[in-house]
């Protein structure tokens, strides 16, 4: 995946040296702001990923024409009015008015306002950095196979409309590239980021429903643009894997802390006491709460607790006030040292983000089925850590 303008030439040089033809996609930042935390929002312009769809300072509201296509004449219909051929060296704006370049003579009195807005949006995209890099990749087509574009907008996104907006913008880029270079991008990868429920108050994205909505939107946009629909790819890693993982912790200490009268829980209710439940893990095996403010829940796993509950905060063993695993959860009032706490939905970005912070050992991973359990990844040992040290 190409992430910046200088990469195509470097990849082309390597491919030529190896006698290969590399398959590449361009990662495009669509300008869609999505994702619950700044660190996992990846489609706005001021971050490290991808190449911007629009020029700096462009009026992104012009892309809103994609939200109301009723006033846009379907390409390839009887309203195809422009018959002139574009010539090499013409501006992108002028080329968009011709034949495959753009199916309308925009000066014709029968052209709707929607048609004009669509031509304006395409012109703006044609002047953007993303199209320039697509052209650069296409220029090396002898050693680079341009597979398509990639648009990952963020992580743990609850609003499926954000994916639809990003998809529409990629369809417009695809149409514009066809208009300027007569090349049809075969694939659009919309990445991942589909939400999962980490706590009782959250919902997982209904992929069946939302992907059906997205498919309808993509079909409609391409029909109006006169383009064949591309292959649409997705990367639902978190949505697939996160619910399969549960992390088990052993309780070390249980410490009630009296709070001032101004303290409140996350629902806004006043609280006078919070119980700090310290366990034998923490930010070394799950950094997400400290890094992103991610929320989890917990349950006692080794026995049935009392019906009475207390407001608790599950914290880790590291010397950090921010070493919090579950910020707020009601646990049985009789929780005690030695209990096992289960924290669900840790199958994604738990073990893979684990570290040896403070020389902590990374725990084992055990696969469990109805009939069997076996160790998939063994527990790290002190000897494992020492193996990295050079004694000479």
Segments and roles (model prediction):
Residues 1-82, 88-187, 196, 217, ...:
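Active-site-proximal beta-alpha core segment in soluble small-molecule metabolic enzymes
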Residues 2-5, 53, 124-128, 164, ...:
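Electropositive phosphate-/nucleotide-binding environments in soluble metabolic enzymes
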Residues 5, 29-31, 152, 191, ...:
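Anionic group-transfer/hydrolysis microenvironments
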Residues 11, 26, 149, 190, ...:
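Conserved, mostly hydrophobic/aromatic
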Residues 32-36, 154, 186-202, 232-244:
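Flexible glycine/acidic-rich beta-alpha junction loops that bind and position SAM and/or redox cofactors
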Residues 157-166, 197-210, 241-253, 326-331:
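Short glycine/threonine-rich loop-to-helix capping motif typified by GTGT followed
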Residues 205-222:
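Glycine-rich and small/hydrophobic secondary-structure elements
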Residues 219, 223-392:
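Charged (often Lys/Glu-rich) extended helix/loop segments that serve as interaction or gating elements
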């Amino acid at each position: 995946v190409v992430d910046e303008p200088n990469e195509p030439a470097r990849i082309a040089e390597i491919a030529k040296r190896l006698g290969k033809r590399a398959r590449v996609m361009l990662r495009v930042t669509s300008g869609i702001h999505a994702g619950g935390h700044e660190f996992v929002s990846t489609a706005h312009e001021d971050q490290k990923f991808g190449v911007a769809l629009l020029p700096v300072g462009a009026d992104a509201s012009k892309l809103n024409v994609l939200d109301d296509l009723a006033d846009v004449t379907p390409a390839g219909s009887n309203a195809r009015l422009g018959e002139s051929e574009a010539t090499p060296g013409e501006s992108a704006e002028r080329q968009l008015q011709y034949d495959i370049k753009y199916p309308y003579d925009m000066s014709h009195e029968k052209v709707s306002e929607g048609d004009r807005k669509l031509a304006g949006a395409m012109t703006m995209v044609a002047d953007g950095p993303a199209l320039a890099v697509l052209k650069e990749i296409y220029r090396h087509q002898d050693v680079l196979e341009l597979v398509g574009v990639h648009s990952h907008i963020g992580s743990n996104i609850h609003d499926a409309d954000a994916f639809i907006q990003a998809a529409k913008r990629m369809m417009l880029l695809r149409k514009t590239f066809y208009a300027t270079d007569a090349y049809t991008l075969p694939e659009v990868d919309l990445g991942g980021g589909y939400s999962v429920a980490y706590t009782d108050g959250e919902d997982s994205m209904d992929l069946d429903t939302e992907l059906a909505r997205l498919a309808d939107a993509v079909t409609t946009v391409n029909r109006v643009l006169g383009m064949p629909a591309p292959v649409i790819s997705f990367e639902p890693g978190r949505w697939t894997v996160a619910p399969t993982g549960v992390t088990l912790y052993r309780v070390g200490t249980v410490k009630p802390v009296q709070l001032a009268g101004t303290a409140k829980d996350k629902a806004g209710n006043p609280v006078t006491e919070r119980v700090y439940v310290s366990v034998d893990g923490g930010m070394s095996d799950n950094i997400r709460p400290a890094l992103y403010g991610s929320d989890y829940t917990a349950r006692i796993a080794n026995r049935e607790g009392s019906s009475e509950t207390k407001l608790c905060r599950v914290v880790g063993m590291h010397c950090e006030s921010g070493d919090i695993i579950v910020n707020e959860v009601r646990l049985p009032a009789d929780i005690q040292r030695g209990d096992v706490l289960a924290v669900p939905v840790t199958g994604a970005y738990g073990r893979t983000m684990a570290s040896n912070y403070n020389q902590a050992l990374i725990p084992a991973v055990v696969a469990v089925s109805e009939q069997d359990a076996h160790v998939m990844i063994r527990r790290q040992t002190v000897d494992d850590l020492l193996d990295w040290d050079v004694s000479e």
